[in-house]
């Protein structure tokens, strides 16, 4: 068994170390992760500067590591096409410090790395702990191990990965596992405007959650109730329910320029 680990918190983050320890007796571990924190980079990739890779040593002889000066998606691409002699059986991204709930998944480097794994046809999982100052990743690591065993035994459709959010609670207070849909978390952005010593303006961006859809069955509702949330996500973003409606707007497939072309023909004949 070969497992590829990555994250967006950086290769030295405690969450990714908790993962390679939990899989120590089960698989050969390949860690390919950013050399520094790359949170909220989404599915960005690096195409305008070189990617540099540093080979790292781990105490575990079954664990092989590379630090990359790129995004989480870069890390998965490099692992798949350059660094690993054979493709992994599973890609795991995490354990992220902080939740990836609802619309967070659109910005998350953690989630995007798992998405990249699925694009390569490899079963993938993104894992986050809801606390920002978590000192113990044990429950999240154990949950990941359980889900990976299920994933190997049962499989998923090829375009789908699992987004997992684990409450920052002791094991005895975890209220089970719920399979959920995405909720919604909208942010009020905050821009701290500053001036550098040369008089140029710059900004620090932050934000606060101000609009939450935590309806029944959502990932947000589950973690609020103390349960582990497991959300199947796929990369087909098509809103199938609106295909016919939008088609009707556009004349059911006829050329949107038909009327304009007729007018041009009339004008051409008139001038002739």
From Swiss-Prot:
Q: How is the cofactor bound, as the UniProt entry phrases it?
A: Binds 1 divalent metal cation per subunit.
Q: Where does a divalent metal cation bind?
A: 8-9, 39, 96
One example GO MF annotation? nucleotide binding
Q: Name one GO cellular component term.
A: cytoplasm
Which Gene3D superfamilies does the UniProt entry name for this protein? Answer: Survival protein SurE-like phosphatase/nucleotidase
> Known catalysed reaction(s)?
a ribonucleoside 5'-phosphate + H2O = a ribonucleoside + phosphate
| Keyword list, A-Z | Cytoplasm, Hydrolase, Metal-binding, Nucleotide-binding
Q: Name one Pfam family in it.
A: SurE
Q: What is its EC number?
A: 3.1.3.5
Cystine pairings recorded for this chain: none
Swiss-Prot/TrEMBL cofactor(s): a divalent metal cation
What's the superkingdom here? Bacteria
Subcellular location per UniProt equals: Cytoplasm
Q: What does the UniProt record say this protein does?
A: Nucleotidase that shows phosphatase activity on nucleoside 5'-monophosphates.
The family annotation for this protein states: Belongs to the SurE nucleotidase family.
- Listed name of the protein: 5'-nucleotidase SurE
Species of origin reads: Heliobacterium modesticaldum (strain ATCC 51547 / Ice1)
What taxonomic classification does the UniProt entry list for its organism?
Bacteria, Bacillati, Bacillota, Clostridia, Eubacteriales
């Amino acid at each position: 068994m070969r497992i590829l680990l990555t994250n967006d918190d950086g290769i030295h983050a405690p969450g990714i170390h908790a993962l390679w320890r939990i899989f120590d007796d089960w698989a050969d571990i390949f860690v390919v992760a950013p050399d520094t924190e790359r949170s909220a980079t989404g599915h960005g990739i690096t195409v305008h500067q070189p990617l540099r890779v540093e080979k790292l040593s781990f105490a575990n002889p079954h664990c092989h590591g590379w630090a990359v000066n790129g995004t989480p998606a870069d890390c998965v691409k490099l692992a798949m096409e350059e660094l690993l002699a054979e493709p992994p059986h599973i890609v795991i991204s995490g354990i992220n410090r902080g939740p990836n709930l609802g619309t967070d998944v659109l910005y998350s480097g953690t989630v995007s790395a798992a998405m990249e794994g699925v694009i390569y046809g490899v079963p993938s999982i993104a894992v986050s702990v809801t606390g920002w100052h978590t000192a113990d990743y044990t429950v999240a690591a154990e949950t990941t191990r359980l889900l990976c065993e299920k994933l190997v035994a049962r499989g998923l459709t090829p375009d789908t990965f699992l987004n997992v959010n684990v409450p920052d609670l002791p094991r005895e207070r975890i209220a089970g596992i719920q399979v959920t849909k995405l909720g919604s978390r909208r942010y009020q952005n905050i821009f701290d405007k500053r001036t550098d010593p040369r008089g140029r303006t710059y900004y620090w961006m932050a934000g606060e959650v101000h609009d939450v859809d935590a309806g029944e069955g959502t990932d947000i509702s589950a973690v609020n109730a103390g349960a582990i949330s497991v959300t199947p996500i796929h990369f087909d973003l098509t809103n199938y329910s609106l295909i016919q409606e939008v088609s009707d707007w556009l004349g059911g497939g006829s050329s949107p320029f038909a009327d304009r072309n007729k007018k041009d023909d009339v004008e051409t004949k008139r001038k002739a």
